[in-house]
């Protein structure tokens, strides 16, 4: 398949002075997908940075919900450009409404210590009663589940998602979300990094609820990501299998945290992600 809608969502139009317009990706009146906004914000920051440096971190704070059918404008501030590093600040708007504030860090790749942990598949205890399937390290052997609920921003014809949950309803809950973009993509590490941010925000706070036996799809809680942070360790290939291994170490006061490692198919950690979000019980 040739590059599809997801890649086109990251084709921003520069309107001058490090200001960019990003296309919408959904019906008017529906809530904009946070991963869409975060990925476009990172793409805007990348457009203002030299091609010799790659993103090392992106931090996005979601301030207001957006409209999925409305284009967004991203204003980038060049905070710092050093010999090997750069820093950018990004503000995201729809009209005059400020939707997000973020920062992105960049660096020229250099030599230094290199190590990685591996996904914790070897210690996982399968809960076949809950999942109906044994855990496997081969994503092709898992059923093609798609996201855990409706996700119009991630069309099934473009993104293959296979979710395997373990120990639901306990503090040891683990979500293993295998994903890949089913499209021909150019060898552009910036595009692949932005696509990783785009895809991995899907139901990003759900592990917070899953620890307690709930889900973002059951209507028991108002849940939404308020802060998304990603540290990029190595180049990501969005068009190959990637494993997002998610846990929730803490929740209190109506908020919770999801931490995750993003691994390539060989088990090497390519990124680390932390999402914070609201998880407020609905009054029946």
Language model features with spans:
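Terminal targeting signals and extreme-terminal segments of soluble enzymes
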Residues: 1-284
């Amino acid at each position: 398949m040739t590059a599809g809608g997801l890649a086109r969502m990251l084709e921003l139009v520069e309107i001058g002075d490090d200001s960019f317009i990003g296309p919408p990706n959904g019906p008017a009146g529906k809530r904009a997908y946070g991963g869409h906004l975060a990925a476009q914000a990172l793409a805007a920051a990348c457009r203002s940075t030299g091609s010799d440096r790659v993103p090392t971190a992106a931090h996005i704070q979601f301030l207001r919900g957006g409209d999925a059918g409305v284009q967004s404008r991203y204003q980038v501030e060049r905070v710092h450009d050093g010999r090997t590093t750069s820093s950018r600040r990004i503000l995201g708007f729809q009209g005059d409404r400020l939707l997000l504030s973020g920062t992105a860090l960049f660096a020229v790749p250099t030599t230094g210590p290199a190590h990685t942990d591996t996904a914790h598949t070897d210690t996982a205890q399968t809960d076949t009663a809950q999942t109906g399937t044994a855990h496997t390290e081969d994503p092709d052997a898992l059923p093609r589940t798609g996201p855990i609920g409706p996700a119009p921003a991630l069309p099934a014809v473009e993104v293959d998602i296979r979710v395997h949950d373990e120990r639901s309803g306990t503090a040891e809950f683990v979500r293993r979300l295998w994903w890949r973009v089913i499209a021909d993509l150019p060898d552009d590490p910036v595009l692949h990094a932005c696509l990783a941010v785009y895809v991995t925000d899907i139901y990003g706070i759900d592990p917070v609820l899953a620890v307690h036996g709930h889900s973002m799809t059951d209507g028991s809680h108002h849940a939404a990501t308020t802060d998304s942070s990603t540290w990029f360790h190595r180049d990501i290939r969005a068009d190959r299998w990637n494993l997002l291994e998610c846990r929730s170490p803490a929740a209190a006061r109506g908020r919770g945290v999801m931490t995750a490692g993003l691994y390539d198919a060989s088990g090497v950690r390519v990124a680390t992600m932390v999402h914070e979000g609201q998880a407020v019980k609905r009054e029946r």
